[in-house]
Amino acid sequence: MIRDITLGQYFPGESAIHRLDPRVKIIATLLFIIELFIVDNFIGFAIAAVYLGAVIAVSRVPLSFIVRGLKPVIIILLFTFALNIFMVDGQIIWQWKFLHITVEGVRLAVFMAIRIILLLIGSSMLTLCTRPLSLTDGIERLLSPFKKIGLPAHEIAMMMTIALRFIPTLLEETDKILKAQQARGADFESGGLIQKAKALIPILVPLFVSAFRIAMDLAMAMESRCYRGGEHRTRMHEMKLKGMDWAAIAFLVVFLAMIIIESRIF
């Protein structure tokens, strides 16, 4: 299950989505996330799902690979669904002692589950279709106007990209440690939820040691290549919006317009 997490991973490809300017993809992802928290009806979520489905189809990333990334958050989805369905007051449709299910609770629980699923898939598509270096350059260019007030745009972009890339790396290390300890007789499967959580405590120390080792190796690699931050750094390919990028922006504007019109009508 740990290997199933797709957030932070890059899926190599030459699709139109892969070739888009990273700034366009970053802004589109941010607007998509904001839209998910604004929408409060099924039609709005349907529009968002169609938009995301079109992006996935054009990106040529296998749907099975994307859906696999939802497995690790199934427990969170179920917990959130149960919390909303039983804790929201309103028109009661079922009741047993202190437990009750309301129309408003069911509606909110379904909306929250859809929102989390679309949020995870949409966020994953950014890293799946964008090379780490391109992602760093895109974030830096978007933050570059703030350099005038002393904001270290390149350093912040580098830290954000490294943090994202560390997610699959740490998960892979966790999987290796779990398998190594299971080979030595450790049991992580038996017992209830609390016992399973306690059984995972012994992996924390080797995981932290491994994380610091990876970070040190990365720092030494950057030092050996004379990395000195963003000052006076040049690029082989300067970013410039092309026809495909403007087409993607137009598609994004149409999507946002549909959401705004739908929210006013319904």
Question: Which functions belong to the PLM regions below?
Answer:
Residues G69-L77, A113, I117-L120, L207, ...:
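Loop-to-transmembrane-helix entry motif
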Residues N41-A48, F65-R68:
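Short, aromatic-rich membrane-interface segments at the entry and exit
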